[in-house]
Amino acid sequence: MAHKKAGGSTRNGRDSNPKYLGVKRFGGQFVNAGEIIVRQRGTRFHPGPGVGCGRDHTLYALVEGLVQFTTKGEKNRKYVTILPEQREEAAS
């Protein structure tokens, strides 16, 4: 004979891992080709010149230069572009 009452199962008790979404490089920052600029779900930001879009809508730099965020078009879409500029090397 059981001396403990059977415990009921619960439907809660799990959590998903964090996805670390968001802007990784901000306007005016220098980026190298291949650096991730924005991790997002869907196209919250659209790729402009010098920016590529990955399979999961991640925006990344195709060229090195300065990041610029702009809003344009009828729908006021946010675009990320790269202004190709040579980085000033620090004299050391």
Swiss-Prot record:
<feature type="region of interest" description="Disordered">
    <location>
        <begin position="1"/>
        <end position="20"/>
    </location>
</feature>
<dbReference type="GO" id="GO:0022625">
    <property type="term" value="C:cytosolic large ribosomal subunit"/>
</dbReference>
<dbReference type="GO" id="GO:0006412">
    <property type="term" value="P:translation"/>
</dbReference>
<keyword id="KW-0689">Ribosomal protein</keyword>
<dbReference type="Pfam" id="PF01016">
    <property type="entry name" value="Ribosomal_L27"/>
</dbReference>
<dbReference type="InterPro" id="IPR001684">
    <property type="entry name" value="Ribosomal_bL27"/>
</dbReference>
<dbReference type="GO" id="GO:0003735">
    <property type="term" value="F:structural constituent of ribosome"/>
</dbReference>
<comment type="similarity">
    <text>Belongs to the bacterial ribosomal protein bL27 family.</text>
</comment>
<dbReference type="InterPro" id="IPR018261">
    <property type="entry name" value="Ribosomal_bL27_CS"/>
</dbReference>
<protein>
    <recommendedName>
        <fullName>Large ribosomal subunit protein bL27</fullName>
    </recommendedName>
</protein>
<keyword id="KW-0687">Ribonucleoprotein</keyword>
